[in-house]
Amino acid sequence: TVPIGDYTGTETSATHTPDHLFAPGSYTFAVWNPAEGITVNGTTATIAAATGTRAGTDAFVNNALGWFFTYTEQVTIEKDKDYPLTAAMKQQVRELTLVVEPTGDAAGRITEIVAHLTGAAGTLDFATDTYGAASNVVLPFTKITEGDDAGKWKATVRLLGVTGTEQLLTAEIRYADGNPSPTTLKSDLTEALKEFNTGKGKSLTLGGTLVETPEGMEVDGAEINGWEEVKGDDVNADL
């Protein structure tokens, strides 16, 4: 989509020639592609609300966005002159993966980790790189059953960015037969995600150890010990 002033065009090839005569003046030249879970008004992208069990609750937004690219430039147009413009598209969605390694005698009894992350950006003005609407996203943890990481739990989401003063992971860890009782997990990811909004062309994987998984029926809660970046293949997209 190519909006310029009161003109909006749609292009599917590498070049776009507007069939439109622009009055002399200053314009914001913007280019962006349609992406799942994202709507655009002017130069502000807004994430759709979450669906499913979290729909309409506590400002939860979509956690599986399509790949979204943008470009903006301020241009001054003079009368009777053609302007060739090149749009170097910028990736605006980044993939985040969290890998958790449970420890303790009850680690093997974990059946489910119900979790969400706070401080995800719900909007982005891509002309000014302004993130807003601090929102929550579901972290869909599943157990890894094969390979070197078997026994760990992993969640992958795609985010427009992070915003606000903090990003907190909150979860309830559930066990087979209700033994032990569910454990509450809270972990601060603010420091680990402080550079998340830069370098979006590279995926980010963070790993941490869950200590200490409770034993028996007594539950005091759990925490993640030392989030660290896990190096792996970059995940990006070509427009």
Task: Go through each PLM region and give its residues.
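Ser/Thr- and Asn-enriched, surface-exposed coil loops between beta-strands
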Residues: 10-14, 79-81, 92
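Tryptophan-paired
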Residues: 1-45, 109-195
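Conserved "repeat-terminator" motif of extracellular CCP/Sushi domains
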Residues: 86-93
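Short, low-complexity, Pro/Ser/Thr/Gly-rich segments in the mature regions of secreted, periplasmic
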Residues: 139-145, 224-239
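Residues within well-ordered beta-strands of beta-sheet-rich folds
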Residues: 30, 97-99
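Structural motif
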Residues: 99-108
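Structured interaction patches on ligand/partner-binding surfaces of diverse proteins
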Residues: 37-84, 178-212
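Intrinsically disordered, low-complexity segments enriched in small/polar residues
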Residues: 206-226
